[in-house]
């Protein structure tokens, strides 16, 4: 991925995680962690974070991952990078729009956050490299 795409991806992930720190009613484990590290003041903007910022930042992370596909052409990396934001979006929308049980929505959201975090660490440790050219992959010459 290009440096800009990687930075945008990290901004989306950090924004989603920090946004989850603000909602004690929705995501008690994340809010407890946020309060423990001094981010308890975010709870006064709980509605803004849950309704707008978490979905926006998760969408930014998803779009950055999908944009990275055009740089590295690795479907496995793109799939793994997309799972976390999609789970986070399903969890937060399931909770705010009441189409999922609260506990199930929380589990899905937390799973999405963990996947986003782990894939982000993996991306920093092992950055993506282009495997194919934009016009297609070269096939190796046949062995004789």
UniProtKB/Swiss-Prot annotation:
Pfam families, sorted: MerC
Subcellular location: Cell inner membrane
InterPro entries named among the record's database cross-references: Mercury-R_MerC
Domain of life where this protein originates: Bacteria
Cytoplasmic side: 1-21, 68-78, 125-144
Disulfide linkage: none
GO molecular function, one term: mercury ion transmembrane transporter activity
Record keywords: Cell inner membrane, Cell membrane, Membrane, Mercuric resistance, Mercury, Metal-binding, Transmembrane, Transmembrane helix, Transport
Periplasmic topological intervals: 43-46, 100-103
Membrane topology per record: Multi-pass membrane protein
TM region(s), chain numbering: 22-42, 47-67, 79-99, 104-124
Chain coiled-coil ranges: none
Induction of expression: Constitutively expressed.
Main location: membrane
Residues where Hg(2+) binds: 23, 26
Entry's Gene Ontology cellular component terms: plasma membrane
Subunit structure: Monomer.
Record-linked NCBIfam families: PRK13755.1, transport_merC
Function comment: Involved in mercuric ion uptake.
Protein name, entry field: Mercuric transport protein MerC
């Amino acid at each position: 991925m290009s440096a800009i795409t990687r930075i945008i991806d990290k901004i989306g992930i950090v924004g989603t995680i920090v946004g989850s720190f603000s909602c004690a009613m929705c995501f008690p484990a994340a809010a407890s962690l946020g309060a423990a590290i001094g981010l308890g003041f975010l709870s006064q903007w709980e509605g803004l974070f849950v309704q707008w910022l978490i979905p926006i930042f998760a969408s930014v992370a998803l779009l950055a991952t999908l944009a990275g596909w055009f740089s590295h052409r690795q479907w496995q990396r793109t799939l793994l990078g997309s799972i976390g934001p999609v789970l986070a979006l399903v969890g937060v929308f399931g909770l705010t729009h009441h189409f999922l049980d609260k506990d199930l929505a929380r589990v899905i959201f937390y799973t999405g956050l963990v996947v986003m975090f782990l894939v982000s660490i993996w991306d920093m440790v092992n950055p993506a490299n282009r495997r194919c050219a934009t016009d297609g992959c070269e096939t190796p010459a046949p062995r004789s």
